[in-house]
Amino acid sequence: MTNPGTLPESIRYCVVGAGIHGLSTAWHLARELKARGTGSGDDIVVIEKSAAGAGPSGIACGVVRNNYFQPAMRELMAHSVEVWDANAEAFEYHPVGYLQISYDEMRDDVLTIHEQQKDIGYESEFIDGEAETHAYMKGIFDDWRATGVSSVLHEKKGGYAHNMATVNGLLAKVQAEGVTVVSETLVTELVVDGGAVTHVVARRGVESSVIAVDHVIAAAGPWVPKLWEMLDLPDTTDIVSGGTTHTVPTWKFWALQEGTLDVDPGYLMNNAGDMPPVVHVDADATLCDEDGNVLVDGKWGIYYKPDFNFGGVQGGYMPYPVEKPWRDVAIDPYGPASPDFVVGEDFRAVWAAALSHCQSRFEGKAHLMSREPSGGIGAFTPDSFPVFDTFCDNVYVIADSNHGFKMVGVGALVAKELVGDVQGLLEPFRYSRYSLGKLHPESNSPYPWS
């Protein structure tokens, strides 16, 4: 192990990014190398441009769910939930379950999810019908009153985790394995020679270092497009669908909308006085504020939970696309420090109204919406699903398309691939799926990632 904060002159594995994926990969890779007698954490360095969890991982809502229409996503998330369950205390993970409450158009999709969850042994319950949905939700929250919904998928596994507690838990595991984590250091160049990356150039302050590498793991969240560009990979991607080829930008950004209602988290306990499941509602009822003004005339979706980490009822609303080429998007400063991508009054009004639409306890509470800056952006792939694949012979790209925080187990699978064991759970997420037309099915959810 090199001294903390010191870059090595050469290293076998260089991980770029100290968020969920970078840290999980480093931790699991160190364990894989040790178990096989082929190395240890001393063979790995993690380079982070700021500090661990300074990107989306550190501001994430922390929801852990299996609710995906795509079979490959469900199977991948079932694996990650096992990792969450096995490390619940270290990651401050709360397995309270997850509720997907949906409108009519989503009914068949959600029923399919339930049926296929049974096939993979992921426990859930499906409630069908408007009256049945209302009765089921009243059994959890006696003030439930949402309209425009007619089914419930109740996942008995899943829940949520405290974001920075999870990051710090992973960081402790990484450092316990002897991995060096270097912060405040920016990767400025990936030197390609003979089709592979031979050196990583990194700058700390005004000093640059050149590191000889055998493998690079690009796990930089919304900064992955910058690493992609360093590798001279394509700006556009050809997608084959229905016998037709469509050329689309490889990367696009979406702005995330999350916030907190400043009430005691205990305000959202269930009828038994216990922590409730995470609530996700997709409705097609007109959404109005307390004065009767129409805020949304059409489909909308929110998610929320009591959260002692955020200090209130925390959650979010549908993201919106950033309508400009990715190079024109100011990724930094990231998150709440951004002058461009923090939520405004429109979000606060809609989210507070949606809470009140669902539960009467939130009526008249719009003025309690936190004014603390919140928000962030995510780099999305051409189909809004992850890409996990090797490029330039020795660069493993983890592009999670903003599904990331919940996928804490992806690092375990990537680690196995880095030592030569191809993982079936990752096969559906290769970049080649676009040109081969092996696309994930699309749901009727108003969200781009469900």
Model-assigned labels for residue ranges:
Residues 71, 75-76, 101-109, 153-173, ...:
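Short beta-strand to alpha-helix junction loop
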